[in-house]
Amino acid sequence: MSAARPSAHETTGTGTASADLLLLLRERQPLVQCITNAVVTGFTANVLLALGAAPAMTDVPTEAGPFARIASGLLVNLGTPHAEQREAAVEAAHAAREAGTPWVLDPVAVGALPVRTRLAHELVALSPTVVRGNASEVIALATGGAGGRGVDATDEVEAALDAATLLARTFGTVVAISGPVDHITDGHRVVRVHTGDALLTKVTGGGCALGAVMAAFASLDPDPLRAAVAATSVYTIAAEIAAEGASGPGSFAVGLLDALDAVTPELVAQRERLA
């Protein structure tokens, strides 16, 4: 059993936004609707639960829209976009926009496959709060070009920064580019997050679950850049902690859930590395 978590009404003494938002998340336990891919549904739900949020995997048309209006945050992940889920994603995104629910678009493999590419362009036009993807996905979404090998990036993170800036300014969104060093921009400011571990790339859902964490944090702060940075810092610091005790991808996946449960605002403040 993990130690009791501090209340958000207690001062952390850290003065860091990421630490303070972690406290707030654990007090509010935001309800995060996840329209995500079939491969990562269980892992994503467990990540949110371990962190202190409440997952809801509501992805059925006629239910997805109404739920997005009452959820704290919404994730739309295009990893396995079957027909019913595509309908639910568009319905939920429209509802979130109308209700002011912050939402995250993860355009998995955009540019590599036609169905998800059309859907990604339709959804980004609805101005998601955050777009999260690898460098190749961000470039493809911004330029209409090819997007690497499915979910794998073939471009460097720095090479995608111009595309991310264009996306952010065009659609009024924050763009988070995942990589060895995550780059996050609102089109004017750029923050680089220097925490994480390569084992995240060896676990199915390691990146997709971060989109759900971003949706949780986006519900807590009116500045989506600050929220995306906090989500990335907390998640990647937990990954570092998990990697320290892991013997490989299997133990890392379990350890990541334990680390997300155990990570404290004080640890976040100590280990966060931003530039």
Curated annotation (Swiss-Prot):
GO terms for biological process: thiamine biosynthetic process; thiamine diphosphate biosynthetic process. It holds the Pfam family HK. ATP binds at residues 132, 178. InterPro entries: Hyethyz_kinase (IPR000417), Ribokinase-like (IPR029056). It catalyses: 5-(2-hydroxyethyl)-4-methylthiazole + ATP = 4-methyl-5-(2-phosphooxyethyl)-thiazole + ADP + H(+). It is an enzyme of class 2 (transferase). Its cofactor is Mg(2+). One of its GO terms (molecular function) is magnesium ion binding. SUPFAM superfamilies: Ribokinase-like. Keywords: ATP-binding, Kinase, Magnesium, Metal-binding, Nucleotide-binding, Thiamine biosynthesis, Transferase. Substrate binds at residues 57, 205. Its EC number is 2.7.1.50. Pathway: Cofactor biosynthesis; thiamine diphosphate biosynthesis; 4-methyl-5-(2-phosphoethyl)-thiazole from 5-(2-hydroxyethyl)-4-methylthiazole: step 1/1. NCBIfam families: PRK09355.1, thiM. Catalyzes the phosphorylation of the hydroxyl group of 4-methyl-5-beta-hydroxyethylthiazole (THZ). Belongs to the Thz kinase family. HAMAP family: Thz_kinase. This is Hydroxyethylthiazole kinase. The gene is thiM.
